[in-house]
Amino acid sequence: FWYMLRSRAVWFFSTSNPTLTFGGFEGESKKEMYDLLPENYFPKTIYISPRQPFEQVQQNVYSGGFSYPFIVKPDVGMEGILFRKIDSEYQLETYHRRMPVEYMVQEFVDYPLEIGIFYYRHPQNASGSITALFSKKLPSISGDGFSTIKELLEKEQTGITEELFKLDEGELDSVLGRGDRINLSFIGNRYHGATFHDLSGQIDERLLNRFDTISHGSRFYYRRYDIK
């Protein structure tokens, strides 16, 4: 509160990332961030307007070199809201017709390890600090050879069971083989059932140098990074 009075600005802290709307704390466009990063630092991405005819969307997707599955999500959004994995043209058309805002089509990166890093740097300093490093474990279920996916979900009592019922009704009655495992979500946050594991013991000078380089190139001074 004192800092707000002293600076005479409610959003005084937004200057920590001057290149982003509200400093990247709320309402920023993902495109804003990606435009400041080298292309090899994020998955292949295109942006779709909700006003585009679906035929144009199809053309953009194919000319962009995408193949199913891929990810769609709003350009402005958080907490995994309206994030979807698209496996077919029908799913893409359904998503497009229901989507009221600009969204992004993004390459599906299916690596087993996802980590989060929190980094900050004062603009006057050459080097910053990494204050958190953690891995994300997505919620999953393992088959027993006779229970359906729906029965396994009910046994697990996961917080996202209802969402899965709505999205994947056709698959809920299939039986998962013994030892076979499927992810219940591809979104790495607590709301969607992910768990987090501390890796701060792995922070070293080499990792810090990498993020110093990113910070100097992008002018991101206060940021969490999600990496696969």
Positions of the model-derived regions?
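Active-site rim elements
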Residues: 20-24, 197-200
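Short secondary-structure junctions and interdomain/linker hinges
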Residues: 5-8, 44, 68, 160, ...
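A long amphipathic alpha-helix within ATP-dependent nucleotide-binding catalytic cores
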Residues: 153-228
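Active-site nucleotide/adenylate-binding loops and adjacent lid/helix of ATP-dependent enzymes
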Residues: 18-19, 29-164, 204-209
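A short alpha-helix capping/helix-coil boundary motif
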Residues: 10-15, 71-73, 191
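Short, compositionally biased low-complexity segments
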Residues: 5-11, 31-38, 177-189
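Alpha-helical membrane-targeting segments
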Residues: 1-18, 24
